[in-house]
Structure formats: structure tokens, C-alpha cells
Amino acid sequence: MAAALQTNIRTVKVPATFRAVSKQSLAPFRVRCAVASPGKKRYTITLLPGDGIGPEVVSIAKNVLQQAGSLEGVEFNFREMPIGGAALDLVGVPLPEETISAAKESDAVLLGAIGGYKWDNNEKHLRPEKGLLQIRAALKVFANLRPATVLPQLVDASTLKREVAEGVDLMVVRELTGGIYFGEPRGIKTNENGEEVGFNTEVYAAHEIDRIARVAFETARKRRGKLCSVDKANVLEASILWRKRVTALASEYPDVELSHMYVDNAAMQLVRDPKQFDTIVTNNIFGDILSDEASMITGSIGMLPSASLSDSGPGLFEPIHGSAPDIAGQDKANPLATILSAAMLLKYGLGEEKAAKRIEDAVLVALNNGFRTGDIYSAGTKLVGCKEMGEEVLKSVDSQVPASV
């Protein structure tokens, strides 16, 4: 059985003379937004608290971000703008033009959460979630980075056995703006038999594949040097092109070991043996599914950050969890995913790796000291609310000696 599961995994060694040829693929992509400048020490950050628990966790992350930055000589100018349901209530649209302008003019954007029961019956164009799609489009972010790390302090919170979950540390790099979610034609029509038919189109151009592949190769290079490209090349033409382009780029990254895996196998392998993965790159819909699957290995989506990057301009950083309207305003939310999103903002958005390391280390210290919000609580640890968890992380940022990279 195990052997059968591995049959569609293939390590690729590409001749040095075979390279992708699109103009876009010839430009190097650094895993950091173009606004990042190592010499710059003052940044404008647009905060989008959004709905539900969003304002609570963003407020805490802002304080941690500001403190970590100040210890490394970094200053921030914060601008808070409405999005989602909050914007609907305020001005009648999920993403006001003023919010778009502020986001574009900033160095990075930190988002809380979007949505809630209150707006569930709105028309499609007036749903809070529309604001998220619109801000992604406005910022032209195309690469979504989703880490899934099982921390030693939380290994027992995983849904998998300890021996399977322990040591998992992977990154899913998801293409964010192409594929079946955006392809045309799409719609619902009535066929010649009078039956309704729904249809969508999976479309990828070579340059779209090349640019996400470059982000993935660069990410893998900075991690453990292993990249697994996930597709469905045995069935889908779009995946055949995907595999071809990713393979072609491999020769430019001889220090990265490339393998390919079909998406159905990848879904099984993430549960069977997640430690085999370092960096995964895949298309929009596969990445949407696999990154959620990977997140559950960690035990709580309240721990997981994400980064969405563009070729140029500000990146969008947000926790992967939803707005959790059922616990909003009750001091029950886990702020760690948003705090870690702030760390990703520093690392990938601004290039401030020392300040980012301070935040990452502070989260570990708070967990080592036994503090837990309800979603990660277990016997023998101290149950705390959202605010107290934030305060503990803030104390840990303060107590650290200068961070090293």
C-alpha cells in the first residue's frame, strides 16, 4: 500500500540547458515584497481590523509589532481603515475606495478577519468576503504563503498521533489570482434539454506559473531545500503546463530538490507522513484545500499566519482563521495567528528579519511559560484570554536580548 501511494512522486533533475523562456520568468523574484528596503526604518502600515474577533487580535498584534520594531530601531505609522462587514455598515460597500488608496500607499497591510452572521443574507456583491477578494486584486498579490508548523509545546493538540505530527514544519505556497476561481467562461446556464448547468474554467498562462514557481523555489531555498509541486497532470491540461514550467525552472535552482505529486496523493500524504514535506507549491484551488488540511495538523487554526505577496507594492498579511462572531468581544480569541502574521509582515513584507525573530521567539516563550487560550488549552496549562495572551507575548518581546538572524 505504501509503495503504491508513492508511485506518482518523482524527483526531477533538469539539464542545465533547458530553461523557461518567458520574459517574466527571466526576472528573479525575491521572497519579499518590492517595498522592502533594508535601509528604511520608518514604515506605514495599513490596519484592516474587519469583523468579529478581527479588531481584538489586530489591536494586540499592532502593540507587539510596534514594540518589536522599536527595539530594533524601526518606526511605524499605522492607519486603520474599514473593510468587510464593518465597511458595509459604515459606507454600504465591503471595500471603500479610501481603504484601497490607503492600502496601496502603505508599505504593508495587516488584516484581521472578515464576515459574520449579520451579513449572511446580503447579495453576493454586498457580502463582506467580497472585500477580501477586492483588496487582493487591488494589491495584485499572487503568492500566498501558509506555514504549518507543529510547535513542541502544542504537539498533543494535533489531530494526528504524536509520532506523526511531531516535527512537522512545512510551507504551502499557493497561487492566488489564477485558475478556476477566476477563469472564464464561468456561469450557470440552461442547456438544450432545459436543465441548468454550472461551469467554471481552469486557466493558467505560462508567466503565472513561472512567477509562483520562483517564489516557491526561493522559499524552499531559504528553508530546507526541498520543493514538492502538486498538480493533476495525469488528467488536466492546465496541470500538464504547470508541471512543464515548474520543471523548466528547476535548473536555475540546483540547490533545491524538486519533486512532483498528484493532488489526490498529496492530500493522503499530508495525513500519512507530513514530515516528508518542506515547501509545497500548487495552484489556486488545490492550494486552498491543501493549506486548510495542513493547518489542522497543527491543532488549531488560531496559531497560523499567512502572507500574500505581489511583484511590487505592499503585501497582505492575515491570520487564516475566520471572524468567529460567536466569541467576538468575549476575550476568548487566540491572537497568536495575527501576532505571527505581523512577524511575517516584518520578514517578508519589510525585510526586518531581526524584529520578526523577536516576535516569533516571544510567542514561543509565552507558550513555554504555559499560557494558553481556550482553543489550545490542555490540563496543566494556564487558561488565559485574548488580552492576557497578548500581554504575555509583549512581555516576552521586552525581556529578550537583541535578536540574532
UniProtKB/Swiss-Prot annotation:
Its cofactor is Mg(2+); Mn(2+). InterPro entries: IsoCit/isopropylmalate_DH_CS, IsoPropMal-DH-like_dom, Isopropylmalate_DH. One of its GO terms (cellular component) is chloroplast envelope. NAD(+) binds at residues 114-129, 234, 265, 318-334. Residues 1-33 form a transit peptide. Pathway: Amino-acid biosynthesis; L-leucine biosynthesis; L-leucine from 3-methyl-2-oxobutanoate: step 3/4. Regulated by a thiol-based redox modification. Expressed at low levels in seedlings, cotyledons, hypocotyls, flowers, roots, pollen, leaves and stems. This is 3-isopropylmalate dehydrogenase 2, chloroplastic.
